[in-house]
Amino acid sequence: MTPWPSQREFSKRAFELSQTRRHLEYHPGTNPPSFTAVVEEVTDEGGVILSESWCYPRGGGQPGDTGVFIIDGKSFPFGEVTATQSINHPLLKSGLANGDEVTCVIDRDRRNSLAKMHSAAHIVSAVANERWGAITVGNQLNIESSRMDLKFENRELFDKDQLTEDANYWVDEDVGINVHQWGRDQIMTDDRVRNKR
């Protein structure tokens, strides 16, 4: 028989289920604005769980946001945001407490660099699919460089110089990028979506 959770465990579980993950409601995009939230918990490991967060957590090959909390003129930087049940903002110096209202400033330069890299990854993925029927099966994006794992129908036909030339063609054309707020059902039924795993 599973024992009843303690009051602290129960409260924590209830909060974890209710934390508002704003990045899921609206694509994080570029130039994220600052936002205000309440510190719901400072974890034993030194992380901060907020009442709501616009920070994008690490996952799926995409690095998480970093930034700084500001309260009463004091700055508290946080490292790369992660998520399990809640979005965790790991503090790089202590000093925040439960109930503090903080302004969260996301590192815009980092977010914007990652957004560019993310767009470039989509271009490379599309070019590899169009030219060789390749499917992107994994990736690890970063600010300076990224890795993409491509699965080819016939690996022998692949030419990295051709891939570079094709991808740069689309970059040089300065083609606009559209961001859609689609649910899974729409994604899975749209013919333009290449990889529907």
Features from the language model and the residues they span:
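Active-/binding-site microenvironments in catalytic and ligand-binding cores
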Residues: 2-197
